[in-house]
Amino acid sequence: MIDLTKYNFDDDDITFLIQTEDWCINGQSEIILEYKGKSFVLEPRGKAVQVYAYGEVLGDYESFDDLLLNHKIDGKPLIELVKELEYGN
């Protein structure tokens, strides 16, 4: 499992509210992702994760890792956006 709990990105393009171990942030079981003015919500469904924006389902994933590796924003997997933020590329 890729541990994102240590990250809390906040810049002009991307805002992450990162999961805790029990998938709960301030009592909410959702993770909000804002990217270039678009808002996304990552919602856990058991071990699975569903991504939706403005009421439209954008993807269903088997795990958070599956989501990071396979969900694409602007043609890039989500993990690439995370790496860009982490390493400043």
Where are these regions (language model features)?
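Short glycine-rich, low-complexity/disordered patches
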Residues: 25-38, 79-89
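Acidic, low-complexity, intrinsically disordered interaction modules
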Residues: 27-33, 39-67
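Negatively charged, low-complexity tracts enriched in Asp/Glu with abundant Ser/Thr
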Residues: 1-32
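Mixed-charge, Lys/Arg-enriched low-complexity segments
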Residues: 1-9, 57-89
